[in-house]
From Swiss-Prot:
Catalyzes the first step in the D-alanylation of lipoteichoic acid (LTA), the activation of D-alanine and its transfer onto the D-alanyl carrier protein (Dcp) DltC. In an ATP-dependent two-step reaction, forms a high energy D-alanyl-AMP intermediate, followed by transfer of the D-alanyl residue as a thiol ester to the phosphopantheinyl prosthetic group of the Dcp. D-alanylation of LTA plays an important role in modulating the properties of the cell wall in Gram-positive bacteria, influencing the net charge of the cell wall. It comes from Bacillus licheniformis (strain ATCC 14580 / DSM 13 / JCM 2505 / CCUG 7422 / NBRC 12200 / NCIMB 9375 / NCTC 10341 / NRRL NRS-1264 / Gibson 46). HAMAP family: DltA. Keywords: ATP-binding, Cytoplasm, Ligase, Nucleotide-binding. The gene is dltA. This is D-alanine--D-alanyl carrier protein ligase. D-alanine binds at residues 195, 299, 490. It catalyses: holo-[D-alanyl-carrier protein] + D-alanine + ATP = D-alanyl-[D-alanyl-carrier protein] + AMP + diphosphate. The keyword ATP-binding applies. It is found in: Cytoplasm. GO terms for biological process: lipoteichoic acid biosynthetic process. GO terms for molecular function: ATP binding; D-alanine [D-alanyl carrier protein] ligase activity. Its main location: cytoplasm.
Length: 502
């Protein structure tokens, strides 16, 4: 695979160049290659089923990149799982994936329940002599390279399989069609269990750059983040728009703080025109790109540079035109392609489309199909095309994007309704300036002994904390005697939305 061969070349020609930096550790290309070779040999000694997935558990440490590379060198796809993921969800991923090995890079124990899975702590990967893996064993072509778990409507996460060819097509697009130069410093804001991280990790490594990671502690302590950014020399900023918006709240977030910054790449949620405008004012030398794509189509498939002309022309920004080897079609409810300017469902076809969900044949057949001989994916997103530009209009169903994370409201509702304190619940997104700011849980409570509503809320949140990641737990909880229904006997979500926005 070109990506792996390129990393090997950098390990040989520039072994002392930094590949990965976080607040505590650094890793060179030479170390990345040698340590991943040793770990790959260790993985191969485990006698795993051919091509079985390996869970890689941890946070923003260099050993995570070492582990990813080791897995694919050993012929196995990896499943990144961040330490922020609750234990209950990790168990579901273990059981769903049928993974036989978990690489624990967290420094703490991980509960694997009664699953038949080996847990290995990579530990010391230094040493004399470097074993050489057989390139013939490396993941390549249509082999699965990584599997990222996304929100599922039944309360069970779905594993999206991305092949080596999918990833190579995406990485080549970023390094060839965006103003990315060799040896640049890439900011990595997203945890590795979120596919936005793929937008910086692999283009960075393919271009001989340095990945500079933002940890949970930095996000929780902006002062620490800004002190670190000042020393970062970041050239390429990859994040959700929400993260940049948070940074813009500090007046010091400007060209003076990051004088080397030349490129912003956004994905994961809608980029408000107001945010793009502020960034161009604060960073006049930097170029801003808006992109769009679901996990099932390898991170992103469209892009547009947000210039002054674009900002003057559109109040809501387009998400751009397709990458090479990709076509986007807008279809109506009958499955027929619509005319330019007509709204419908966004269908993605071509080299970026995933092979489907791991172990979920029915779900795969529902979402993935062949369109004019090419692999295609039904996004469930609403949109339209105009003069070659795609406009994203949100979800057709109840799946949403919140701070870059794709969330199915049904999954949150399912988990809230499992609480003994809840009779019924509906989750409503609260919008501000064209994007979702937070979630509101509308609850009909079951009988309870709490005197105050905040005590009830705390108890429900405690139940949710063991089942859902923090970003999926609603910010506000509102209580009422009944959930309004439509004449058809369905939950009246429109009325609920109107009530919470008054």
């Amino acid at each position: 695979m070109k990506l792996i061969e390129t990393i090997k070349k950098y390990a040989q020609t520039q072994p002392d160049t930094l590949a990965f930096v976080n607040e505590e550790e650094k890793l060179t290309y030479g170390e990345l290659w040698s340590q991943s070779e040793r770990l790959a040999a260790r993985i191969q000694s485990e006698a795993l089923t051919d091509a079985s997935p390996i869970i890689v558990y941890g946070h923003m440490k260099p050993v995570m990149a070492v582990s990813f590379l080791a897995c694919v060198k050993a012929g196995h796809p990896y499943i990144p799982v961040d330490v922020s993921i609750p234990a209950d969800r990790i168990l579901k991923i273990i059981n769903s994936s049928k993974a036989e090995l978990l690489l624990n890079n967290s420094g703490t124990s991980v509960d694997t329940g009664d699953a038949l899975i080996s847990v290995v702590e990579p530990g010391v990967l230094e040493g004399d002599g470097v074993p050489e893996t057989d390139p013939g064993r490396w993941v390549h072509g249509e082999d699965t390279f990584y599997i990222i778990y996304t929100s599922g409507s039944t309360g069970n996460p779905k594993g999206v399989q991305i092949s080596a060819d999918n990833l190579q097509s995406f990485t080549d697009w970023i390094t060839n069609d965006f103003p990315v130069e060799s040896g640049q410093v890439f900011l990595n804001q997203a945890p590795f269990s979120f596919d936005l991280s793929v937008m910086d990790l692999y283009p960075c490594l393919q271009s001989g750059g340095t990945l500079w990671t933002v940890t949970k502690d930095m996000i929780n302590r902006p002062k620490l983040l800004f002190e670190a950014l000042k020393q970062s020399n970041v050239n390429v900023w990859t994040s959700t728009p929400s993260f940049a918006q948070m940074c813009l709240m500090d007046p010091s977030y400007s060209e003076e703080l990051l004088p080397e910054l030349s490129l912003f790449m956004f994905c994961g949620e809608t980029l408000p025109a107001s945010v793009a405008r502020q960034l161009k004012e604060r960073f006049p030398k930097a170029r801003v790109f808006n992109t769009y794509g679901p996990t099932e189509a390898t991170v992103a498939v469209t892009s547009i540079e947000v210039t002054d002309d674009v900002l003057n022309k559109y109040s809501s920004l387009p998400v751009g035109s397709e990458k090479p080897e990709t076509e986007i079609v807008i279809i109506n409810e009958d499955g027929k392609a619509v005319q330019d300017g007509e709204k419908g469902e966004i269908i993605i076809t071509g080299a970026s489309v995933s092979k489907g969900y791991l172990g979920e044949k029915a779900l795969t057949e529902k979402a993935f199909f062949s369109y004019n001989g090419s692999p295609a994916y039904r996004t469930g997103d609403a949109g339209y095309k105009e003069n070659g530009q795609l406009f994203f209009l949100g979800r057709l169903d109840f799946q949403i994007k919140l701070h870059g994370y794709r969330i199915e409201l049904e999954e949150i509702e399912y988990q809230i309704n499992q609480s003994r304190y809840v009779q019924s619940a509906v989750v409503i997104p609260f919008y501000r300036e064209e994007k979702i700011e937070y979630l509101i849980a509308m609850i009909v409570p079951a009988e309870h002994d709490f005197e105050k509503e905040y005590q009830l809320t705390s108890a429900i949140k405690k139940d949710l904390g063991s089942k859902l990641p923090a970003y999926m737990i609603p910010r506000k909880f509102m209580y009422q005697k009944e959930i309004p229904m439509t004449a058809n006997g369905k939950i009246d979500r429109k009325r609920l939305k109107e009530e919470v926005t008054v």
